[in-house]
Amino acid sequence: MTPPILRRLDDLRALRRDWMKKGDTLGLVPTMGALHAGHLSLVEAAKAACDHVVVTIFVNPKQFNSPEDLANYPRTEHEDAQKLAPYGVDAIYVPDPDQIYPEGYATTVSLTGVTDVMEGPNRPGHFEGVATVVAKLFLQSGADRAFFGEKDYQQLMVVRRMARDLDIPIEVIGCPTVREASGLAMSSRNMRLSAAATKTAGQLNPLMEAAATRLRAGEDYAPLEAEMRAQLSDLGFAEIEYIDLRCAQDLTSLDRLDRPARMFVAAWLDGVRLIDNIAV
């Protein structure tokens, strides 16, 4: 059965009030739509942990750096609802724009530290947009838990810090990245890749895993980074924004593996910006 679609905040809050009266818990899965198996894995995690699940779909204009990127982002509400039908989701919250940014809206949520590296400098204003809309969705829904993919690991850390700093009583749960058979991290942007580029993109994760194996064996990071840059360039990646080794807890930069860490990559292929990260 296709879940009901809610477009007004009052309708979402009415549902939440009914559940709270029963002492039921709510899991929130925030998305921008164009759902794939990665999103559906978050829904499964939410269903396993909570009495009720609401999936949100909102293409947030404030987290896009390019008007073209915003215009090209896929909008597939009907297909998304069909994909969610077998999962027993209680509702899909697809707020009208004025439910998130009403006339005269003047507040943004801005963080420092965790936003100062990687995606922060490369996408100015992006994390302000993310933190602002996610804070609103947390407060609007009153959810007990929210589920995010580790594919966007820096975003996960931003959301956790934001909720902690603003005393929003919600548990932010990170879920493992879901990958294609090739190892390519699932992303709504992948559908914009040509067949040839999709095949090339599938080589990114094996390169990262090979580098991680060498790091665990004691190799220094700088030579590995240079080698990976050359390999990606040879494969046809047009621009490599960063290949970073960072502490998994605070995202400080590392030059060798001396604590729990993650490797992060952002690069352009076939006009599409791809990001990935793995535990090391």
Swiss-Prot record:
Chief site of localization: cytoplasm
InterPro entries in UniProt: Cyt_trans-like, Pantoate_ligase, Pantoate_ligase_C, Rossmann-like_a/b/a_fold
EC number: 6.3.2.1
Top class in the EC scheme: ligase
Positions annotated to bind (R)-pantoate: Q63, Q155
GO CC annotation terms, alphabetical: cytosol
GO MF, one example: ATP binding
Compartmental location: Cytoplasm
Record-stated family: Belongs to the pantothenate synthetase family.
Subunit structure: Homodimer.
Protein name: Pantothenate synthetase
Source organism (scientific name): Ruegeria sp. (strain TM1040) (Silicibacter sp.)
Gene coding for it: panC
